[in-house]
Amino acid sequence: MDRYGHNVRSDIKKQGYEDSNLPILCETCLGENPYVRIIREENGKECKICKNVFTHFRWKPGENSRYKQTVICMKCAKVKNVCQTCLFDLQYNLPVQVRDKFLENSIVLPENETNRNFFLEQMENDMSSTYDKMNRINMDLSKLKRRDPYFKRNMARVCSFWRKNSCNRGDECPYLHKEIHLDKSLSNQNIKNRYTGENDILAEKILLKHNEKNNDDKNMSNKICIQGISESVSQANIKECFKKFGDIKSIKVIPKDSKMFISYSNSQAAKKASDKYKDGLLLNGCNLTVHLQDNPTYNNKNQQPVINYMNNNMYQNNMSPQMMYNPMYYPYYNMNNMHPSSAPYSSMLPSEAEQRK
């Protein structure tokens, strides 16, 4: 008689309604005001994910901010370890799609409402399998982590009446009276896509930027070249001067060419060293020239392979149609396209009359 009978509710979804005193929020959504006032409403709204009624919270993060509210229930937020408002990860402050790509362990909710509610209840009873208990550290994810809150995300919207020159509120208007330039590609974001981590526009933009940065780091060399080395400059002096930019892997000295090559553990350290001493370095009375050593793999990737013309006939017979190379051009004063070491044709041999002369 506790669950049914006299304990009948008007809405069947309210039989297992959520009763919470505080929301699960990130530092950005909570705002910079330490004395924020939160309005609590029991059974105020329906969760955008599981469609269950939950305790709704509403507050104003700052003086020039707009009112924010919770859009998903606490149960769905705990399963994915996300904020109830922006649906960003609480630990890394990143979209779910970015986090799941590096952790390679995503939690997928069933599409059916009954199965989804049962799955959420089981996950709430055993929270050890959720993201909240994950202690796995990913280096790429730590680099993408947003360490400082971004309060500009809470700013008010632009006043539509101000755009029409008809706003009569003046300074009391809670909306902005200035234009802000936002990325139009982020205007069609979806709450469900953000939560499930599928087709998230913002996450795809972050991953694309991360991939471009990694490609630039791979193409950039981690070695610098120092020219003008003399006997007054020792290897210890060079190491003492360049170790502040990063971890040095190896140092190679070529006394014949008066050069020295320093290899760092990453390309960023080599770039810092070359930018610091791009105008030259004076060490022990010796003027040194420092520049970044080019990456041969990156510079030669567009060059064509060298063709061996020693066995030209055999090469043409064995060459596949896909392998097409530009022919070798010879100067106008030498029209003979044969290799110097190849045997001459019979027509090129001198005649008997020429041999008698």
From Swiss-Prot:
Reported uses of this protein in biotechnology and industry: Possible candidate for an effective malaria vaccine as determined by epitope response in sera.
Gene3D superfamilies in UniProt: 3.30.1370.210, 3.30.70.330
Zinc finger (C3H1-type): 153-180
GO cellular component, as recorded: Prp19 complex; U2-type catalytic step 1 spliceosome; U2-type catalytic step 2 spliceosome
GO BP field: mRNA processing; RNA splicing
Subcellular location per the Swiss-Prot or TrEMBL entry: Nucleus
UniProt xrefs under InterPro entries: Cwc2/Slt11, Nucleotide-bd_a/b_plait_sf, RBD_domain_sf, RRM_dom, STL11/RBM22-like_N, Znf_CCCH, Znf_CCCH_sf
Keyword Metal-binding: yes
Keywords: Merozoite, Metal-binding, mRNA processing, mRNA splicing, Nucleus, RNA-binding, Spliceosome, Zinc, Zinc-finger
Residue spans crossing the bilayer: none
PROSITE patterns assigned: RRM (PS50102), ZF_C3H1 (PS50103)
Domain RRM: 222-295
One function term, GO molecular function aspect: U6 snRNA binding
Domain comment (free text): The C-terminal RRM domain and the zinc finger motif are necessary for RNA-binding.
Subunit note: Probable component of the spliceosome C complex.
Function: Involved in pre-mRNA splicing. Binds RNA.
Name of the protein described by the UniProt record: Pre-mRNA-splicing factor RBM22 homolog
Organism: Plasmodium falciparum (isolate 3D7)
